[in-house]
Amino acid sequence: MTRQCPPQESGAALSGSVLAEAAVVFAVVLSIHAAVWDRYSWCAVALAVQAFYVQYKWDRLLQQGNAVFQFRMSANSGLLPASMVMPLLGLVMKERCQTAGNPYFERFGIVVAATGMAVALFSSVLALGITRPVPTNTCAISGLAGGVIIYIMRHSLSVGEVIEVLEVLLIFVYLNMILLYLLPRCFTPGEALLVLGGISFVLNQLIKRSLTESQGDPVDFFLLVVVVGMVLMGVFFSTLFVFMDSGTWASSIFFHLMTCVLGLGVVLPWLHWLIRRNPLLWLLQFLFYTETRIYLLAYWSLLASVACLVVLYQNAKRSSSESKKHRAPTITRKYFHFIVVATYIPGIIFDRPLLYVAATVCLAVFIFLEYVRYFRIKPLGHTLRSLLSLFLDERDSGPLILTHIYLLLGMSLPIWLIPRPCTQKDSLEGARALVPYAGVLAVGVGDTVASIFGSTMGEIRWPGTKKTFEGTMTSIFAQIISVALILIFDSGVDLNYSYAWILGSISTVSLLEAYTTQIDNLLLPLYLLILLMA
């Protein structure tokens, strides 16, 4: 996040910040490797080494403008931190499920790790293939690491699991070609790897479960169908509006009609097929099942109203000011972080399944409103463009505004990714008890405090970056205080004397926040989740 110290622009400074970011990522990789210590963790180490070398090739391609697609230019490629998320997440999921004696989800964790390695290797091969002259040494390192990974995975995965990994890789390749063409400057290569890799895996899981008629928790199917449905809707309308003007009333009416058709004719029947009941009735019964849920929904509605009032108030201030290019200051943008923290903490403490579903619904609403804004759909399209432009920052350089969606994802992914079948009564012991709070700690508290204190009182900059030492230290301190408050108010959290690991995890992720130029709302919670679950 921004801290208002002038950044250094020299190539040496940039290289230093990239090296520091890489050092933090390697510290995480080696920590997980030491905790797991099997052939899969050795694969993760090999992947990190090759991603470190290939990352510089991506950076050079971006600087020279020779990348295949138009990527976000205000950051480095971010290949190394993004490449390690899915593999490390799969490794820690495998360990937890192996300890819990759940062989099915243990294998699922291995598939997640293998899939993450496959898409990361593809991104590396893409960079090496378009680099001129061909980087012989980097190709040798990448080929050696890739050969080791493929050899180990070939002798570890079943034929069905190999096919599943290849299916995800195929979907990932097609999504890259489609979405990176339709959405220029919205992603760095690392962000594209992380976001599109996750979407590809979700899409493949939904197809697999639909074809096999597998049984599962309806809330999991609800998340899968909503994510895939919204992505397919975006691809459909992006393709359609290439041939017609989306800003007319006729196009807007057609947009709303087709949204209803896709929702009622595709998404709802698909969900009905998976959960074997009426989706709308199930959702209503689920939301109003207990009095606690009714109170939480009322409380969240109040917070949503407050967020809307903040947006309207800030835009009213802009209208009355002399400069129409006025942008909200850092502290104003952090209001939404405070609101999100106030939203998630009661949900985590009192009713996590409700929070799981509510976050899914909120994600669908956010994406739909972004479609309305992006396509200028009447009657709200132009209004949303005006209201949200106030809160843009340097990361919103493409046609889409994704910061608020990344914030929601960063807070929700720790809730969605908990391996519930591998936990005892949906609870974890030790540092793992804080896994649901990973988004709250890393983004809601840590990133917010770091940004506010760094921009107002920060003087000592970390080398090669505009982030400040004071901001990072206050971030760590605020997260420690938050952990203490969680212990007081959440009786289900038992840290079991794992305080040193928690402090190390928080400090490591705070250092990553100081050096990364990627979307920290998404990256930081995932790394904290991985460390806490290890």
UniProtKB/Swiss-Prot annotation:
<feature type="topological domain" description="Extracellular">
    <location>
        <begin position="377"/>
        <end position="397"/>
    </location>
</feature>
<comment type="similarity">
    <text>Belongs to the polyprenol kinase family.</text>
</comment>
<feature type="transmembrane region" description="Helical; Name=1">
    <location>
        <begin position="17"/>
        <end position="37"/>
    </location>
</feature>
<keyword id="KW-0812">Transmembrane</keyword>
<feature type="transmembrane region" description="Helical; Name=13">
    <location>
        <begin position="433"/>
        <end position="453"/>
    </location>
</feature>
<feature type="transmembrane region" description="Helical; Name=4">
    <location>
        <begin position="133"/>
        <end position="153"/>
    </location>
</feature>
<feature type="transmembrane region" description="Helical; Name=8">
    <location>
        <begin position="253"/>
        <end position="273"/>
    </location>
</feature>
<feature type="topological domain" description="Extracellular">
    <location>
        <begin position="183"/>
        <end position="186"/>
    </location>
</feature>
<keyword id="KW-0418">Kinase</keyword>
<feature type="topological domain" description="Extracellular">
    <location>
        <begin position="131"/>
        <end position="132"/>
    </location>
</feature>
<feature type="topological domain" description="Extracellular">
    <location>
        <begin position="454"/>
        <end position="468"/>
    </location>
</feature>
<feature type="transmembrane region" description="Helical; Name=12">
    <location>
        <begin position="398"/>
        <end position="418"/>
    </location>
</feature>
<feature type="transmembrane region" description="Helical; Name=2">
    <location>
        <begin position="73"/>
        <end position="93"/>
    </location>
</feature>
<feature type="transmembrane region" description="Helical; Name=5">
    <location>
        <begin position="162"/>
        <end position="182"/>
    </location>
</feature>
<feature type="topological domain" description="Extracellular">
    <location>
        <begin position="315"/>
        <end position="333"/>
    </location>
</feature>
<feature type="topological domain" description="Extracellular">
    <location>
        <begin position="242"/>
        <end position="252"/>
    </location>
</feature>
<feature type="topological domain" description="Cytoplasmic">
    <location>
        <begin position="1"/>
        <end position="16"/>
    </location>
</feature>
<comment type="pathway">
    <text>Protein modification; protein glycosylation.</text>
</comment>
<feature type="transmembrane region" description="Helical; Name=9">
    <location>
        <begin position="294"/>
        <end position="314"/>
    </location>
</feature>
<feature type="topological domain" description="Cytoplasmic">
    <location>
        <begin position="208"/>
        <end position="220"/>
    </location>
</feature>
<dbReference type="GO" id="GO:0180047">
    <property type="term" value="P:dolichol phosphate mannose biosynthetic process"/>
</dbReference>
<dbReference type="GO" id="GO:0019348">
    <property type="term" value="P:dolichol metabolic process"/>
</dbReference>
<feature type="topological domain" description="Cytoplasmic">
    <location>
        <begin position="94"/>
        <end position="109"/>
    </location>
</feature>
<feature type="transmembrane region" description="Helical; Name=15">
    <location>
        <begin position="492"/>
        <end position="512"/>
    </location>
</feature>
<feature type="region of interest" description="CTP-binding">
    <location>
        <begin position="455"/>
        <end position="470"/>
    </location>
</feature>
<feature type="topological domain" description="Cytoplasmic">
    <location>
        <begin position="490"/>
        <end position="491"/>
    </location>
</feature>
<feature type="transmembrane region" description="Helical; Name=14">
    <location>
        <begin position="469"/>
        <end position="489"/>
    </location>
</feature>
<dbReference type="GO" id="GO:0035268">
    <property type="term" value="P:protein mannosylation"/>
</dbReference>
<dbReference type="InterPro" id="IPR032974">
    <property type="entry name" value="Polypren_kinase"/>
</dbReference>
<dbReference type="GO" id="GO:0004168">
    <property type="term" value="F:dolichol kinase activity"/>
</dbReference>
<feature type="topological domain" description="Cytoplasmic">
    <location>
        <begin position="154"/>
        <end position="161"/>
    </location>
</feature>
<keyword id="KW-0808">Transferase</keyword>
<comment type="function">
    <text>Catalyzes CTP-mediated phosphorylation of dolichol, the terminal step in de novo dolichyl monophosphate (Dol-P) biosynthesis. Dol-P is a lipid carrier essential for the synthesis of N-linked and O-linked oligosaccharides and for GPI anchors.</text>
</comment>
<keyword id="KW-0472">Membrane</keyword>
<feature type="topological domain" description="Cytoplasmic">
    <location>
        <begin position="274"/>
        <end position="293"/>
    </location>
</feature>
<keyword id="KW-0443">Lipid metabolism</keyword>
<feature type="transmembrane region" description="Helical; Name=10">
    <location>
        <begin position="334"/>
        <end position="350"/>
    </location>
</feature>
<protein>
    <recommendedName>
        <fullName>Dolichol kinase</fullName>
        <ecNumber>2.7.1.108</ecNumber>
    </recommendedName>
</protein>
<dbReference type="GO" id="GO:0043048">
    <property type="term" value="P:dolichyl monophosphate biosynthetic process"/>
</dbReference>
<dbReference type="GO" id="GO:0005789">
    <property type="term" value="C:endoplasmic reticulum membrane"/>
</dbReference>
<feature type="transmembrane region" description="Helical; Name=6">
    <location>
        <begin position="187"/>
        <end position="207"/>
    </location>
</feature>
<feature type="transmembrane region" description="Helical; Name=7">
    <location>
        <begin position="221"/>
        <end position="241"/>
    </location>
</feature>
